[in-house]
Every structure is written in structure tokens, then in C-alpha cells.
Amino acid sequence: YRRQRQMCIRDRYGAFGLKPGTLNGEILLNLDSEDEGELYIGCAGGMDVTATLEYKEVAPEEGDVAVKVTLKGLRGGHSGLEINEGRANANKLLVRFVREAVASYEARLASWEGGNMRNAIPREAHAVITIPAENEEELLGLVKYCEDLFNEEYSAIETPISFTAERVELPAGQVPEEIQDNLIDAIFACQNGVTRMIPTVPDTVETSSNLAIITIGEGKAAIKILARSSSDSMKEYLTTSLESCFSMAGMKVEMTGGYSGWQPDVNSPILHAMKASYKQQFGVEPAVKVIHAGLELSLIHISEP
């Protein structure tokens, strides 16, 4: 039952299937609140952004060795409800290391695996890189430096972050250098986290993105992002920005699964009536909130404006 309920909430099948003209009323009250004493007056829309690229692998250089670096121990969390907490994104941390390893120690990227769900802040990521054998010790020093740095930067937010390295078998192929550099730059530049708070509800996130899943290896690269916003115009701005970022890296970018947000109206007459009625009934003011996740009301609002 719990799994079925979560599927229905996440996919909102009923609301997506609502046909225009089904409802006759002019005022819609949202009673969808998990906790008593709360009134929700807005929610985020979303869009799945997927960037893909195929390439022909090249062989590692003679005399190179392979090292697998693994980043784990992050808190992760829901990419809407907890995106405002500033939690670390494993993909965004790992790209900082990889970019420096390439620039300073002649490292080459063979593969990358990070994150597993679009709506979850990635907790783990790992990559296999090749490097001249004489640079291996310096690379291990960079791993330790980055582990200490990441823990210092996120000491007030994260549990201890683990960043380790181990020698692995040399892969048969790796990403060509020019494509590798473009991919790394795009991942590094990709917007992640909160873009803007709601001007009329300043303690609530309006627009955000989550660099959720990265898979690179065996001639294919795929990057999956979830963009959210209660403002449709800001959602379009964000997704266009993401598209531009990865298009410049030569990737094919697709937008799918989009749905509109429900922009809050703090001056709505029915909101004031609901607040007054609640206080009359229970003697306290209700908490008026906006959720940075999807609710059926955004879809109903589009169907029945």
C-alpha cells in the first residue's frame, strides 16, 4: 500500500488525466496537507533535462595506471524539500577533483557513475581515471587534500565525507581528450541547487536544479537533471540555461516530463477567508506554506484556470 501510494503521489495520474471543463466551480480549496494547521498555497513545477553524447573510446597511454576514486557518506535527500539546506552534491564535488587532476597531473577520464534518482540529491559518486605512473603519489595527495577540504566546507551541514582512491585494472578505453574536457567543463558549470527564492514568500525556494545522475563510459555519456520552479517563466529560464550549458559541450539535450508550477498568491481573497475561518475554529493562525515539490493543484490549475 505504501509503495502504491507513493507512486500515485509522485506521478499524479489522476490530475494529469483531468479534462478541461470537468469542474464547475470557480474557487478551489487545497486541503492536501500532511500536518494539521498548515495551508499550502503554491508548489513547484518541474522538468527533466537529459544530456547525452556518444563517442569513440581511445586507448590509455603506455605507462599509465588506473585509479578509482570514490566519494561517499553524503546526506543526500529530496531534491525539492531539502535543496535549500545547502547539502553537498556528490557529482559537483567529484568534478572539482577531476578537473584539477586533469589540469595538474595529466589525468584522463575513463568512466564516471554518480547518483541514481532524479529527485534525490546524489550521495555517492565514483570515477576511474588514468594517469602517468610517476604522478600517482601526487594524485593521492590531491585526494586527501580534497577530502579534508570538502569536510571543512560542509562541516556544519554534512556527516563526515569519505573520499578514497584505489589502484584498479587499466581500462581498455577512455574518453577522448577534447570530449573529456568539454564534459568536465559542462558538469563544472552546470547550475545546481537554489537559483532563486520566492519574492513574496522569501523563506521558500522558487527555482532550483539538481545535477542528479551522471554516467560516462563505454562510449556513452548521460547527464540527468531535475529542474523545479513555482514560476513557469523561471523554469523556462533555468532549463534553457541548462540546455545551453550542455549544448556547448556538443551534447544532445532533451526536455521531458514537464509540468507547471502553482505560483502562490498571498493576496488571494479565499486565502484570507480560510485563515480567518481556521482561527475562528481553532483559536490560532494557520501556517501558510509553499512546497518546493509537485502537488496536483498545479495541474488542476492549468486544466481549470
Where are these regions (language model features)?
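An extended, acidic, His-containing surface patch that forms the Zn2+-binding/catalytic region
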Residues: 166-210, 215-218, 232-237, 252-303
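Midchain, well-structured core segments that form catalytic/ion-binding scaffolds
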Residues: 16-228
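Short acidic loop-to-helix transition motifs that present clustered carboxylates
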Residues: 10-11, 36, 291-296
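A generic structural signal for well-ordered alpha-helical segments
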Residues: 102, 246, 278-279
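Single conserved hydrophobic/aromatic residue that forms the stacking wall/gate
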Residues: 1-9, 301-305
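C-terminal, non-catalytic macromolecule-binding modules
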Residues: 224-250
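Beta-strand segments within the central parallel beta-sheet cores of soluble alpha/beta enzyme folds
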Residues: 3-6, 109-112, 255
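Catalytic-loop motifs flanking and including active-site residues across diverse enzymes
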Residues: 2-3, 90-94, 238, 270, ...
